[in-house]
Amino acid sequence: MRIAFTKMQGLGNDFVVIDALSQPLSLTASQVRWIANRRLGIGCDQVLLVTPASLPAIDFGYRIFNADGGEVEQCGNGARCFARFVREQGLTDKNVLRVQTASGIIELQLETDGQITVDMGVPRFAPHQIPFKVDQEADYYSLELDGQQVEIGAVSMGNPHCVLRVPAVDTAPVAHWGPLLESHPRFPQRVNVGFAQIVSPGHLRLRVYERGAGETPACGTGACAAAVIGKRRGWLSGQVNVDLPGGRLGIHWEGDGKSVWMSGPAEIVFKGSIEL
């Protein structure tokens, strides 16, 4: 079966996006791994599917698969690419979209300047919602790592995140601590790991080790997680520029019980087809 796809990227975080409306398909984990393979397939951090809406008030379904073949709940950079894809493909003429993810409904706004703003939903801090194994909720937690105690914040942005504050992201132990924290037994569904350097109340630098993908140039949910953890700790304001290796995202959050809004670019790289 030959499937048409579009290769897209948001701040260097790259995706293979497939219209599963006009060409219905159900991908196996091995097919996802093959598509994502940078030597044998197309190559990407994640595979995104546009699927039929399941509710009248929803425009599309949005499914997300990591490069390791596992389906995940949310991806912010992917959501921006998703929004641009459905407009470019002529699947909608709307500027505001409501899409269904595995973690709930999100709103996507296509701005006149080409940026895309995403309602990433309300962050969840309750340990059972992350999920994170701990007796009670707190603003920060101590984990043992490499024989030392490491202080983290934990939050769900539709997918689990932990955030560490570091003096400088350039020298942060991302390659070593990233996989150790990703698979830490206190996170039963594994976790995305953010290494955050606070530059000023309105500016942070961030590197993210993504669950199932490793370090990537950018992570939208990771940027949201770092911004909300930083605001909760009193380090950051409600409007923050987040600089990742791939570029800058704007994050706005007014506080507990409010949605996080993320703004950034989405670009088409090329189009093609692949035999599955």
Swiss-Prot record:
Molecular function as annotated in GO: diaminopimelate epimerase activity
Known catalytic reactions: (2S,6S)-2,6-diaminopimelate = meso-2,6-diaminopimelate
InterPro entries given in the database record: DAP_epimerase_AS (IPR018510), DAP_epimerase_DapF (IPR001653)
Residues at which substrate binds: 13, 46, 66, 76-77, 159, 192, 210-211, 220-221
Site keyed Important for dimerization: positions: 270
Main location: cytoplasm
Keywords carried by this UniProt record: Amino-acid biosynthesis, Cytoplasm, Isomerase, Lysine biosynthesis
GO-annotated biological processes: lysine biosynthetic process via diaminopimelate
Site feature (Could be important to modulate the pK values of the two catalytic cysteine residues) residues: 161, 210
UniProt pathway: Amino-acid biosynthesis; L-lysine biosynthesis via DAP pathway; DL-2,6-diaminopimelate from LL-2,6-diaminopimelate: step 1/1
Pfam families: DAP_epimerase
Active-site residues, as the UniProt record annotates them: 75 (proton donor), 219 (proton acceptor)
Subcellular location: Cytoplasm
GO cellular component terms given for this protein: cytosol
Highest taxon in the source lineage: Bacteria
Enzyme Commission number(s) from the entry: 5.1.1.7
Key word Cytoplasm present: yes
Quaternary structure and partners: Homodimer.
Functional note: Catalyzes the stereoinversion of LL-2,6-diaminopimelate (L,L-DAP) to meso-diaminopimelate (meso-DAP), a precursor of L-lysine and an essential component of the bacterial peptidoglycan.
Family: Belongs to the diaminopimelate epimerase family.
Stated name of the protein: Diaminopimelate epimerase
Gene: dapF
